[in-house]
Amino acid sequence: MEDSNSTASNVARAILAVVDFSSTSDTRKSAVQFLDSVKSGDVRVLAKTSFHLVKKEWSSEIRLHAFKMLQHLVRLRWDELSPPECRGLVNLSIELMSEVANASENWPLKSQSAALVAEIVRREGPDRWQEIFTLLTSLSAQGPLQAELVLMTLRWLPEDITIYNDDLEGDRRRLLLRGLTQSLPEILPLLYNLLERHFGAAMSEAGMQHFDLAKQHADVVIACLNAIVAYTEWAPVPDLARYGILSGCSFLLSSSDFRLHACEVFKLVCSRKRPSDASTAEFDSAISNLFQILTNASREFLCRSSSSSSVIDDNDYDFAVCMCESMASLGSTNLQSISSDGGVMAVYLQQMLGFFQHFKLGLHFEALLFWLSLMRDLLPKPKAATYPSGGGSSTGGDDSSSQVDSEKKKTLSLINDDISSAILDVSFQRMLKKEKVPTGIALSLGPLELWSDEFEGKGDFGPYRSKLLELIKLTASHKPLISSTKISERVITLIKHLLASPAPLQHVAVMDSQQLALDCIVATLFDGSNEFAGGSSEVHYALRGIFEGLLQQLLSLKWNEPELMKVHVHYLDAMGPFLKYFPDAVGSLINKLFELLTSLPHVVKDPATSTSRAARLQICTSFIRIAKAAEKSVLPHMKGIADTMGYLAKEGTLLRGEHNILGEAFLVMASSAGAQQQQEVLAWLLEPLSQQWIQPEWQNNYLSDPMGLVRLCSNTSFMWSIYHTVTFFEKALKRSGYRKSNLNTTSATTPASHPMAHHLSWMLPPLLKLLRVLHSLWSPSVFQTLPPEMRAAMTMTDAERYSLLGEANPKLSKGVSVYADGSFEGTKEGQAEASESDIRNWLKGIRDCGYNVLGLSTTIGETFFKCLDANYVAMALMENLQSMEFRHIRLFIHTFITYIVKSCPADMWESWLGVLLHPLFIHCQQALSSAWPGLLQEGRAKVPDLFGIQSGSDMKLEVMEEKLLRDLTREIATLFSTMASPGLNTGVPVLEHSGHVGRVDMSTLTDLHAFRSNSMVGFLLNHKSVALPALQICLETFTWTDGEATTKVCYFCGVVVLLAKLTNNVELREFVSKDMFSAVIRGLGMESNAINSPDLVNICREIFIYLSDRDPAPRQVLLSLPCLTPNDLHAFEEATAKTSSPKEQKQLMRSLLLLGTGNNLKALAAQKSQNVITNVTARTRLPASAPETIGAGVLWDEEFVQ
């Protein structure tokens, strides 16, 4: 006895030493070691000591840890006890729960007592469940405190099944689930009886003003509802109804204290999947009854809240949200249970419409998700509706449609004109953000809560507005006439209000928000997928009348303010798809656009009037949108547009940037007219540019040396002329037959097939000269000689810095306007001098567009590769590679190198890729290898970029440096991944699924040279000088803390391993077997590679499986691991030889690596720790009067989780 007390005292002192913050680290470490020794020592001593320390005479810290020790015993050492000892511990644990069930005990001890019993039930399984359940039932009858603990135990049992637990094997989980399922006829009535008994007692005690007792009974009700929630997730719904659970919860809806918890039960039931067995009828009956309960409750709320917004408090709101979520879940998951009754469905839709129309944003948002889901499901997927009649839509079913389609048609017919109109009205009204509503308009909205930045938990405004627009689109597909009428009336009403307003600019935000709705509806009805031409003539006539009337209203407007004109143009844009079917109005719309353009000043002297410049650019961009939307309807007007452009250019009232945009619109129009028209338009647009572009005078004057570029930047007019020429080259390449799909193959189209092909020979040489001299500015020897203003202009733009910092881009200064494609328009164009900002924007624009032009030029066939000399291109672009900033190298790889790698014909790899990739890979390897150690060891990446920020911003500087380093690392890794893509490696067979270990037939091995023309990776490996720096980057990437880059590199390394397997190249095999294998294992030591660990383990598996018979290195690498013995390796080889499953082999390799490193591979060791029932407050909605000690319980549980 004395020994037992002595051990208990020593354990108590050790516990106090661990929790005492003043303890030294050595003291705490010794205490932990002692406690571990007790837990791993004699199991009976552990039991006696723990039960002794949970007694009341000990402090709460000691008692709590003693409970944890008991849980450890039950969880890990239960099998060491004899059956009588186990039975005795069960009884002691139940008694212990009874002892702590008093008001003076704190919450953590109560929760751990219940958790201990739950652990015992989990270990014992169904064998002793009946005995334990009898004890629990008896305990629950002793009083509210005891009942609460019993309910906590009952709650945790099913929760431990439904939440995955590594500590519970599949068989025991199934046994426990089966035992609980068989016990539902006992458990569910107990839950109902406790719920009924203690709810009545709580009401009774509260009526007698015995508030302490009332709270105890109320806590039992809450605990009971939490337990019910845990069973509701998996117990058969008919059982929940049969044993009174649903009716009991429905009764609680009348209580403001418990209705939210009861509604949580209903929400879970509504989301349960409808069975397809014999219980379907019972399930439908339960859901139907539940629907009636929710309908009555929601009707009462909607009627009460519609009369006055002041009657809703937070409790009402939370309950209403839960009701709305429940009903929405019912409609999304179990609509079939009520859809057969048209009257019930009509009531249901009206209820959900009421929530959608509610002034509270949270309720509206939940209903929005429901309506979106419903309309997506009801409307046919391949095509939107055709309209045989004016009333609605055909749902696309045929005579042989299934019963499901028939039900959908029936439900869709219930969404009538009134419901559709209401949905549209609400959607239109809520398209505006609260912060943009002027005060006067805000007052007219009343209590309506518009979306606000202060609204939490529902994401950003952009995604919310997108959901509204999708609902508008779906409604327009279902009810075209209703939606057209509503949007037309809405727009015309807003126009009238604006015209009558003394401050029309206040209405800009409201007008602009509705343009999106108009754009959505017009595009839905006239974009072609609706088979508009196939609908009835009555509908066509009605729609034409509606939109012709609206277009006439828009064309008659004469707004003079630039901000209003921008909105006006947006509305005209939105009408584009309508013009495709009714081309008569195209001429009027084009004339209106030119009228708006010429009414605005083309020369901006005062920066405050730069809104005019932005409005002009918006008008020009509208021509592109109209050309794309109206398609062939614009073709008859091309000559008129060209004549007007010529006249305005001759008059000097059309700036080059504006001319470029209109030229781009012409290219869009020409794409609808055929190849011949496209060639003619390109010739018309490019010929004037070529006359200046190919002249040797400007090239000799400005592009012969770096100082020439400085002179160019002092000639502002010519500087911007060059800029607009390059940007138009980019637009012409994008709009004239360029297709992204070309990038997925190495086969090239015939040069004549692309209208831009024969222009490359004169376009590209001067561009290469321009880029070469631009690159030279960053050379240290040149940089020092540049004027201060030029050096300052070579720093980052504000937008680039904000992007690196992950912050919202600031509004561009008033000195800069932006095209639709993101390029810049200098406000001093045509003037004598360019500012620092102008030069910075010009340099960035030339680089961005120049790289894009080169990249796009490679995609149109072999012309690029035949009209240029590879060595000259390499010299022009790579000459100053050593001086390039990381941001520029990343852009260069992304917009040019990747394109040329994808597009270069295989027979030209030798002449092109070798000269371009060799200097690039060498420099990137040196730069990255220098920068990463600085980040990993000193916390500061060494990058050459010029940030242009003031001192004192060290933290921001560090963030930007790291972002630049990671961006470049990921870009080069993406390039490697591209080079390893199947389309560029057609000669490499796909890895077989079989993983059999065996000797490779040496006769099947080929020379690596055989892959140099049918595999990009093979080509690379055949050029050692190019391959070595690339492979070095790959190996180092594994130890850089960038999981995204590692993902890309793994793909490349996989192909390298495959080529090592297929070829007889000794050097490659040795590299893969030793260097790559070792590097991959080192990569598994990085926690940042946890997400890539399956790929890394697979590479290890492939290296060993495919190469260990031909090279000793894989075995040597594994045996060099600190904890691996030859016997371990031998056992691994025997195990892998017995299975051909790659999945099983990967698991074996993973286990071997963990064993060999002593579980020291962080990427693999980041596993879920053993689950213990400690999350005692999870999914618990606490009553407002809950004691603060509950929060303390969470803290204690986390502290003693181990």
From Swiss-Prot:
Positions of post-translational N-acetylmethionine modification: M1
Gene Ontology CC entries for this record: nucleus
Null mutant phenotype: Reduced size of roots and shoot lateral organs. Accelerated vegetative phase change. Increased adaxial trichome density. Disruption of phyllotaxis of the inflorescence. Reduced fertility. Reduced levels of several miRNAs and increased levels of their targeted transcripts.
InterPro entries assigned to the protein according to its UniProt record, in alphabetical order: ARM-like, ARM-type_fold, Exportin-1/Importin-b-like, Exportin-5_C, XPO1/5
Classification via Pfam families: Exportin-5 (PF19273), Xpo1 (PF08389)
Gene Ontology MF terms in the entry: nuclear export signal receptor activity
Protein family per UniProt: Belongs to the exportin family.
Subunit annotation: Interacts with RAN1.
Protein name: Protein HASTY 1
Organism of this sequence: Arabidopsis thaliana
Native organism taxonomy: Eukaryota, Viridiplantae, Streptophyta, Embryophyta, Tracheophyta
